[in-house]
Amino acid sequence: MSKMKFESALRYKEEAFIKFKKDFGHAYGSQTYHLLDFDRFCLAEYPHKDTLTEEMVMRWSVIKETETSNGYLSRITTLRQFGKYLVMMGEEAFILPDGLKGGTMPLMPYVFSPESLKSFFQYTDTMERYYQSTVRHLVAPVMFRYMYCCGLRPVEARHMNREDVNVQTGRVFIRESKYNKERVVYAPNELLSLTKRYLDQISAVFPESTAMFVDRKGQYFSKSTQQYLFEHCRDGAGIKTSGTRRPNMYSFRHSFATHRIYQWHKEGKDISTLLPSLSAYMGHSKYQHTLYYLHFLPEQFSEMSGFDFERFSEIIPEVYEE
């Protein structure tokens, strides 16, 4: 390790931080390697930047596909401590948010690109009537749009009643959610016009059913039926696995959160002050669960550069607990 040295514009601050840690009895072996890795990143990407900024921290803090949970957490913890040290010394620095727990780091989620999202809904919108189900081609375009536009869990979409959606105000009551935590969200206007037409069509076929999204018998979707329909649409749209990431029904929810945070970033808004609203909207039991998306987001920036988010500007309004 004696042959390794810090070379970026942050080198003097990094060396002082390592000395500070060792002076207090910390071996700081693997942590030094992490900081050296960050230093090489800064030398290549920010050769003249001597301030620890949010952009450089977030770009380096993306979990790698081959990285274990423990390895990832060790790496970002080192950078978080470096940021705290700089602030303690009176320096301006971005501190990586706390909240990640060992053993609970999920795999990198699949996030729909603009092209894949467009392909998926183009397929659902042009599905033909299936001989074994008179409504499948009607349900798919609406149910999966609710999962994306409102960030719903698959089970939340399955349990929706027709009376849960107010097509005049956009108010959507989410029942039987995870942790038995009911909540209210609001659907964007673009989705409401589609919903009105859908309800008219479904009511004509199954007038007695209370389910929002019905199977071929007019009953609530089962988990397996919903999964089968998603896979049928995904494969029909030609959406493939990306690296180790495979699109699943939760990808709509991951995409909703990631696209929303990206839009805030694009608009120059303070993401840290808006995350609690997103956390409540999505029904997260802990604010830390929402923080995960901050660590997955930088990798998606280049893929989403041409995405039009303006029509989803109403996706996250006030959240009401009931």
Describe each region flagged by the PLM.
Residues 1-322:
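Conserved catalytic core of the tyrosine transesterase superfamily
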